[in-house]
């Protein structure tokens, strides 16, 4: 079993950092690198690319809205064309920096409010995916399973890789419990270990209501801003390996056998 472990990386500006990116890069197999709008700057982006290259980690763009004060979690009013431009601009910036270091951007993982806006509008989602396809038809789209983003990626001719979020609670419909709701964020190590083991062995997760639902995923995400994120990511990786799995970058997970 090949499975990816990913985290959002380079989420800072100047000397400010969200997490220990150096430590996290030694654990994950794919890095979603902030591209300068909600977080990130050219120096940080370049450092993340170099770290990923040193550790054999796949590189992905993590575009967000230009909401620095709200860390990209506040929705903003943009037309569909404007939003497509924001996405392409950020991916393009990371692609250029990566190419300059002899690396390639392989995937896209939308950040917070940007992802929420795209994922509730079929027409907008398709426009965004078509814009990404024009930029690079080999790009992989990270999404949750059975979502507008996953369907739009497929319709646009892009490959997608589905996620299980180790540090976020799900409701009975398989949706993420909104941040700010009690129990939405899961940072207790034993709980994360149990959730990941259940997903790996049974393909299910216990919802916040106490029900069991199926989860279809090829990658496990740990948010870098979750308290103890590095330790949680290490737990995720150890559970995969204990189950006989191989942790490998997204492009290798979905590559033809």
From Swiss-Prot:
Keywords: ATP-binding, Hydrolase, Nucleotide-binding. It holds the Pfam family LamB_YcsF. Its EC number is 3.5.2.9. GO terms for biological process: carbohydrate metabolic process. One of its GO terms (molecular function) is ATP binding. CDD domains: LamB_YcsF_like (cd10787). It catalyses: 5-oxo-L-proline + ATP + 2 H2O = L-glutamate + ADP + phosphate + H(+). The keyword Endoplasmic reticulum does not apply. Forms a complex composed of PxpA, PxpB and PxpC. Catalyzes the cleavage of 5-oxoproline to form L-glutamate coupled to the hydrolysis of ATP to ADP and inorganic phosphate. PANTHER family: 5-OXOPROLINASE SUBUNIT A, UNCHARACTERIZED PROTEIN YBGL-RELATED. Belongs to the LamB/PxpA family. This is 5-oxoprolinase subunit A.
